Each structure stands twice: as C-alpha cells, then as structure tokens.
Design a protein with these regions (language model features):
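Active-site region of the double-stranded beta-helix
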Residues: 1-46, 62-113
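Conserved SET/PR-domain catalytic core that frames the SAM/AdoMet-binding pocket
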Residues: 46-59
C-alpha cells in the first residue's frame, strides 16, 4: 500500500501474466474496468491451476498465512518496454480504480478440492 494507506496495484499494457501457486496459498485482487463485474478476488492453491491476468487489469496479491511460492510466466506483446510496464498505481491517484474498490462488491473465486 502507498504512503497514505491506499491500495497499490500493478497494470500492464503489453503483457499478460500467468500465475501458478506451487506451494501455500495466495489471494489475487483484480480490477478490470472493461469487465461486466470489474472487481474480483481469486484464492489460489496448488490445486487451482494457473490464473490468467490479462493486460489492462489492475492486480495485486497477498500470500496466505503459511506463505506461498508462485511462478509468474509472462506473455509479452509488441510494444513491451520493461521501463514502462512495472510501476505501482495507487487507488488514491486513480479515480476509476478508487470508485470500483469503493462501490463494487468483489466476485470471490475459490477452488475447493
């Protein structure tokens, strides 16, 4: 989170992320302004499979209490520039992101096996 306590997210314009938990658990928080339901919480474990985070999606994650090991495989598109893709975005500085977090109920996803 940023210096005023607002949530910080990453967003990529030229990269999709594929995240797979190999140990422990991790919760991903996703916001995509183009989706019908823009706010999602996704709880992943080893049994869950990979999570696709498409470009244009605000995302952040947090390990479960036992910690986690996650593999992130990226698919990059023409126009990718590492110096421009990996910067945090604060909800306090992005009005659309702030409004989704404040006004939308998250869709919660968990795989139970």
């Amino acid at each position: 989170d940023d210096c005023v306590g607002a949530k910080s997210f990453y967003i990529h314009s030229f990269q999709d992320d594929y995240n797979r938990v190999v140990q422990g658990s991790r919760t991903f928080e996703l916001v995509n302004l183009q989706w019908k339901y823009p706010y999602h919480l996704v709880n992943l474990t080893r049994q869950s499979g990979a999570l696709l985070i498409p470009r244009g999606t605000f995302h952040r994650s947090k390990s479960g209490e036992e910690g986690s090991i996650v593999i992130n495989q990226a698919k990059r598109y023409d126009g990718f520039d590492a110096s421009a893709e990996f910067y945090p975005v604060s909800a306090s500085e992005n009005r659309e992101l702030y409004n989704v977090l404040r006004n939308e109920k998250p869709v919660i996803h968990s795989v139970k096996i």
